[in-house]
Amino acid sequence: MKKEFTLEIHSDNNFSVLNRIVNVLNRRRVRIKKLIAHENEDDFRRGIAVLLLHTTPDLMEKVKHQLEKLIEVEQATFCEGCDLYFELSEKNNKQVA
């Protein structure tokens, strides 16, 4: 049964990384509901992407491992539900404002 998952990805901050992440999700037919991407406040060369996804737990585990194989990705973590997504998006909005 499909559920909502929050996926947080820490990676290099360059142009092709976000495209590669989206390609991995599209190949697996994972639905992206929301996406936030921003650079790390301490190091502009590092970036963070937070995605709200709609998929199965088994497929989410496979996507996580596939994303961690990308050279630019440092780590990928996910949790069930959308609470973490909204918490991280509020934190990001406060930093921007």
Language-model features, listed with the residues they occupy:
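A conserved regulatory-domain signal marking ACT and ACT-like small-molecule sensing domains
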Residues: 1-97
